[in-house]
Amino acid sequence: MANNMTDTMTKFDTNNDSASLQQNGNKAGQSWFERPIPGIKQQLIAQLTAVETEPSTKCSSCHSVITNTALIFNCYVCPHCDHHLPMSARERLNWLLDQVEGELGQEFTAKDPLKFVDSKPYPDRMAEAQDKTKESEALIVLYGKLRNLDIVTCAFDFRFMGGSMGSVVGDRFVQAAEKALADKVPLVCFAASGGARMQEGLLSLMQMARTAAAIERLRIAGIPYVVVLTNPVYGGVTASLAMLGDIHLAEPKAMIGFAGKRVIEQTVRETLEEPFQRAEFLLKHGVVDEVVHRHQMIDTIYRLLAKLCSVPNVDAQ
């Protein structure tokens, strides 16, 4: 009798437990972790959906996927491997300047005097680059305030036909140098270019001489000219404005040279080992003055300009 009663009670308790589980929405074999808690599941789904739908970028070094919001917040430096990803010209300048007072050179537009055609006409290439970057040319020039310093600054946009230097790029750089000369303020240039623009032929090559002459006028007047070498800098830009600064800074692992590694190897018939043409290699051989992490770049530029211009360093006060 006692045994029958115990069996009945056990069965009753088991039935109650089953009913309770069904009431809580659990199925057979479902663990406590899988039990739905009101509100929590919906929040998790919303968060996961937001991450999946937010625009992301894959790091070209470690291949990690980074949301664009996180990338912008970290100055386009990979939070996983510290690789420096490209920045657009306008983002660089807005990032550098505390106050933008104006832009130079917007009146200059590219012409096609050679009627150059490779796989497509030059005007078509220009239109594609303008649509891609939302910029009219490969060089952007702004002037404004870096803390307590007035400066003129320019930056190449490598997305615009490889940051190539044509007549408009030359015009804008010369105008930037003339503005710095007239106002007696420093000029800072962020270089990122594949070199002279082949679609403009000799007109493009002439910009090397024009920009060099403009920099020489700054030197004679004692106006500081600082160059930041980003990845990559090659060709006619390296052979002119990018290597004529008073101070040369470089971002980590930036590729810097005149001809590319493959061209040099084919010419000298030797294999060139890494880190040939990297910023660190050039620092070791005295070509650049300092390799600076992007997070320290603004402070470094300001510190150098404050010293060169003999103005009080507000960071030191």
From Swiss-Prot:
For the CoA carboxyltransferase N-terminal domain, which residue ranges apply?
A: 55-317
Major localization class: cytoplasm
Which pathway does it serve?
Lipid metabolism; malonyl-CoA biosynthesis; malonyl-CoA from acetyl-CoA: step 1/1
Which of this chain's residues are annotated to bind Zn(2+)?
59, 62, 78, 81
Instruction: Please tell me which top-level EC class this enzyme sits in.
Output: transferase
Q: Which cofactor does it need?
A: Zn(2+)
Reaction(s) this enzyme catalyzes, per UniProt = N(6)-carboxybiotinyl-L-lysyl-[protein] + acetyl-CoA = N(6)-biotinyl-L-lysyl-[protein] + malonyl-CoA
Which molecular function term from Gene Ontology is one that the record holds?
A: zinc ion binding
- Its GO CC terms? acetate CoA-transferase complex
Pfam families on file = Carboxyl_trans (PF01039)
Positions of the region Disordered?
A: 1-28
Record keyword Transferase present: yes
What's the Enzyme Commission number for this chain? Answer: 2.1.3.15
| UniProt subcellular location | Cytoplasm
Q: What does this protein do?
A: Component of the acetyl coenzyme A carboxylase (ACC) complex. Biotin carboxylase (BC) catalyzes the carboxylation of biotin on its carrier protein (BCCP) and then the CO(2) group is transferred by the transcarboxylase to acetyl-CoA to form malonyl-CoA.
For this chain, the family text in UniProt reads: Belongs to the AccD/PCCB family.
* Entries under HAMAP family matching the protein: AcetylCoA_CT_beta (MF_01395)
User: Quaternary state and partners of this protein?
Assistant: Acetyl-CoA carboxylase is a heterohexamer composed of biotin carboxyl carrier protein (AccB), biotin carboxylase (AccC) and two subunits each of ACCase subunit alpha (AccA) and ACCase subunit beta (AccD).
Q: What is this protein called?
A: Acetyl-coenzyme A carboxylase carboxyl transferase subunit beta
